[in-house]
Amino acid sequence: MNKKTRIAITGPIGRMGRMLIKEIQNNKHSHLTVAVVQKKHQLIGQDIGRIIGIGEIGVLISDELNIKKNDFDVLIDFTRPAGTLEYLKYCNKFKKNIVIGTTGFSKEEIDIIKSYSQKIAIIIASNFSIGINLLFQLIKKTTQIIGKDSDINILEYHHRNKIDAPSGTALEIGEVISKVMNWNLNQDSIYYQKGITGIRDAKKIGFSIVRAGNIVGKHTVMFSSYDEEIKITHTASNRMSFARGAIQSALWIHKKNTGLFDMTDVLSL
């Protein structure tokens, strides 16, 4: 009988953390063993299951200083860049693999993550839903066929509390398009603002961003020519698709030794 993969979660009290824990407990191949919060958090020592409303599960909330080597097999982290880099240090120290769903990293921070992947296995993705990763493939194919004849725009919508813009997923869509078109995303992007903007440059990707209400996530890519327009849209109804993808990633990476991976590796796309 195969042992369950023991998973540690950072930010367990947040919306994503709660969803992850519920899905971990429902997955027959995984179970939660560590729920990590910041130092001196008022809920340290309490049962995380009771706190998130699923009843006691025997896992007490702890801070990062209490992570022990034998507590977990894989860490799932959806926090902020500075926190992720600290958790990477722990994983590297204890030779534990990590799944990173945090977005908003700088180029320098990405380079740090890449350096850690020489010592442990890391999965990093802007979006863990299977649907959005299929969308990446559709965008790639569409760009190959009509990209040179289209104005391309990315529209992304998220809840009012999201602090980074554009979203990591929108930027990844932009990278998919840029690679096909041989563009530089940083140089070949348009962020729409008020005022006289001038005629639209054909060889750039337009970004439009909405932050409102409780929108989980919606991404639309428009390919517009003089004769027709194609829209490809993915809408997340809730965060469960992200949670399932992250846990699938944790199970996949458990036995890996080193390397930097993404959802195309997990899904064999």
UniProtKB/Swiss-Prot annotation:
Enzyme class, UniProt record, top EC level: oxidoreductase
Amino acids binding (S)-2,3,4,5-tetrahydrodipicolinate: 159, 168-169
SUPFAM superfamilies: Glyceraldehyde-3-phosphate dehydrogenase-like, C-terminal domain (SSF55347), NAD(P)-binding Rossmann-fold domains (SSF51735)
Gene3D superfamilies in alphabetical order: Dihydrodipicolinate Reductase, domain 2, NAD(P)-binding Rossmann-like Domain
Active site: 158 (proton donor/acceptor), 162 (proton donor)
Keyword hit for Zinc: no
The enzyme's E.C. designation: 1.17.1.8
Keyword NADP part of the UniProt annotation: yes
GO terms, biological process: diaminopimelate biosynthetic process; lysine biosynthetic process via diaminopimelate
Pfam families per record: DapB_C, DapB_N
Keywords in alphabetical order: Amino-acid biosynthesis, Cytoplasm, Diaminopimelate biosynthesis, Lysine biosynthesis, NAD, NADP, Oxidoreductase
GO function term, MF aspect, one: NAD binding
Residues reported to bind NAD(+): 11-16, 101-103, 125-128
Pathway(s) it belongs to: Amino-acid biosynthesis; L-lysine biosynthesis via DAP pathway; (S)-tetrahydrodipicolinate from L-aspartate: step 4/4
Any one GO CC term of the record: cytosol
Subcellular location: Cytoplasm
Catalysed reactions, as listed in the record: (S)-2,3,4,5-tetrahydrodipicolinate + NAD(+) + H2O = (2S,4S)-4-hydroxy-2,3,4,5-tetrahydrodipicolinate + NADH + H(+); (S)-2,3,4,5-tetrahydrodipicolinate + NADP(+) + H2O = (2S,4S)-4-hydroxy-2,3,4,5-tetrahydrodipicolinate + NADPH + H(+)
InterPro entries named among the record's database cross-references: DapB_C, DapB_N, DapB_N_CS, DHDPR_bac, NAD(P)-bd_dom_sf
Binding site for NADP(+): 39
Family annotation (PANTHER family): 4-HYDROXY-TETRAHYDRODIPICOLINATE REDUCTASE 1, CHLOROPLASTIC-RELATED, DIHYDRODIPICOLINATE REDUCTASE
Family (UniProt): Belongs to the DapB family.
Quaternary structure annotation from Swiss-Prot or TrEMBL: Homotetramer.
Function of the molecule: Catalyzes the conversion of 4-hydroxy-tetrahydrodipicolinate (HTPA) to tetrahydrodipicolinate.
Protein name: 4-hydroxy-tetrahydrodipicolinate reductase
Species of the source: Buchnera aphidicola subsp. Acyrthosiphon pisum (strain APS)
Lineage of source species: Bacteria, Pseudomonadati, Pseudomonadota, Gammaproteobacteria, Enterobacterales
Gene from which this protein is expressed: dapB
